[in-house]
């Protein structure tokens, strides 16, 4: 297993190292996720990851003296998920290279931003029946499970009564998970609502993280805002990060991220550069993640 911070430290080239460091600076989720770096980039025609998801855990019981312990068996689901190649390519004219050398940096920054946006959108709403080249996200994994909740509180006109009712729903929702989650993933609009609820209830908590970002929290749990349309609903996703819970998947050997600059020595006026991130996600236990869906419109 590996984090992107460890991948950056071990990267052979400064270009990849800098690119990955920029990603983890700008994306808490990508910096916090642990990746199972277990897949080979050669010797296979597809990138798939098979694992066991614990749907119902084992149950321990007391036994009487001189009796055998009662047997317990977990309910396990075998899951096969796809690992995807998330990429962005760009063209640059050789004249522009000489006239505007900062275009290199601009293209790399935009590639980094594009990869973060697409990863954030897919980690929630990814569905390989819609995009066969992507990977399945959290929404698909938790739909219809014991951690799939729907709110009954109307948050359009906030007052103390609705704020308290929402807080009770959040307590019920979070208590259904295997432990306190590491992060709540929300849309910008829902983050505004949660911040307003926290102010009404007098539990507002805003700090600064190590990257200099302002961080809001709900009862000590980080609230991460997924911008640029990555999450279009007011649903709240909670995730317990780790290899026993929700984690990423990528290639082994430090090959998760690649960055290629144009070859200006080759013939041709227009050259191509690209950046790629091989990624997927796995939910090892049903209770390692959940969703509190917004109240349906009436």
Q: What residue ranges belong to the model's regions?
A:
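Phosphate-interacting basic helix/loop segments used at nucleotide- and nucleic-acid interfaces
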Residues: 167-172
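Sequence/fold signature of self-assembling virion shell proteins
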Residues: 2-36, 43-45, 101-102, 135-165, ...
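Assembly/oligomerization interface modules of large self-assembling protein complexes
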Residues: 2-89, 131
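Long, contiguous amphipathic alpha-helices that act as assembly "spine/axial" helices in icosahedral shell
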Residues: 46-54, 72-143, 175-193, 260-281
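A generic local secondary-structure boundary/capping motif
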Residues: 173-174, 224
